Design a protein with these regions (language model features):
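Beta-sheet repeat architectures centered on beta-propellers
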Residues: 42-56, 62-295
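Generic structural signal for coil-to-beta-strand starts
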Residues: 18, 26, 56-57, 64
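Surface-exposed extracellular loop regions of Gram-negative outer-membrane beta-barrel proteins
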Residues: 17-39
Length: 295
């Protein structure tokens, strides 16, 4: 196939009217008459790292997750690039992919995330990425020790996604079913990206409230991180419907709102009940204040 001649074939799957063949660093198609090499420097790096869904073939390379219908592949994982960049080479080469409904799933092992200055932020274990093809949105799961996926059609479920696990005794499990994780409680947590509040990024803003609209949930907690400082909890809890939660300073000072350039919001629920968040909004005032230096 070209590229690294020592790289063995890891992708061998029909899509459309061609046979797609891939090694770690190259792709080719066979159309019953000739072999055409793409020679793009990308390939499929895992024996289980590809899956077909909704007329397309998806596969994982060292640089991300790609989609093709038999032609040139398209990178679709830009929004979760930090997770793939933070995965190890061994984790990517052991990746597994599967599908359930309108979503594809990809396990990538241990992931280390980094701050913009290059310092280590956090390490996530047993990461699985979900991509919803209908709304083109990504969801990140942790703690799923999946080594291979398979979709089965049963008498009551046409989209039962099973996976082989490295848990004790190597059980076969079903993904996204029930209300526990193999008998363990599932904590609910959503973290936003770092949000710049003012159009002029150097200006200071005053944050007042977090507004949470929830379809399910009864004891939802909210944490904020101002200017990349550690998260701290704000007072009150949210429940089903719309809840307005006042943002106070870390020391609980209610006299004046916190000042910041950027903010991250973390929504968490440990009530052992199902939780579903529809929308989150912030209220704040921009100012013309600025400082010589502020993170």
């Amino acid at each position: 196939l070209g590229g690294n001649m020592d790289s063995r074939i890891k992708l061998f799957e029909t899509i459309g009217n061609v046979l797609m063949i891939g090694t770690n660093d190259n792709l080719a198609i066979w159309d019953d008459y000739k072999l055409q090499s793409f020679d793009l420097g990308i390939g499929c790096v895992s024996d289980n790292g590809y899956v077909k869904a909704l007329g397309s073939l998806f596969f994982i390379g060292y640089d991300g997750i790609f989609q093709t219908s038999g032609g040139l592949p398209k990178l679709i994982s830009a929004k979760v690039e930090k997770y793939i960049d933070g995965a190890t080479k061994a984790g990517l080469e052991a990746a597994a992919m599967g599908k359930k409904g309108n979503s594809i799933f990809c396990s990538i092992g241990t992931v280390t995330l980094y701050n913009p200055d290059g310092s280590e932020d956090m390490t996530l274990s047993d990461v699985v990425l979900e991509y919803n093809l209908r709304i083109q949105a990504w969801t990140i799961f942790t703690g799923i020790k999946a080594t291979q996926f398979a979709t089965y059609v049963s008498s009551d479920d046409v989209n039962s996604l099973q996976f082989a696990s490295t848990e004790t005794k190597y059980p076969i499990m079903e993904l996204l079913t029930g209300e526990t994780d193999n008998g363990k409680e599932i904590p609910f947590r959503i973290d936003s990206s770092n949000i710049s509040l003012s159009k002029e990024f150097e200006k200071i803003s005053y944050v007042h409230e977090v507004i949470i609209e929830s379809e399910r949930g009864s004891n939802i907690q909210c944490f904020v991180s101002l200017d990349r400082e550690p998260f701290y909890e704000i007072e009150g809890t949210a429940r089903k419907g719309a809840t307005i939660m006042k943002i106070t300073n870390k020391d609980g000072d209610h006299a004046k709102p916190p000042r910041c350039r950027t903010i991250k919001v973390s929504i968490r629920d440990f009530s052992k009940q199902l939780c579903k968040i529809s929308r989150v909004a912030l209220t704040y005032n921009s100012s013309n204040e600025e400082e010589q230096h502020r993170d």
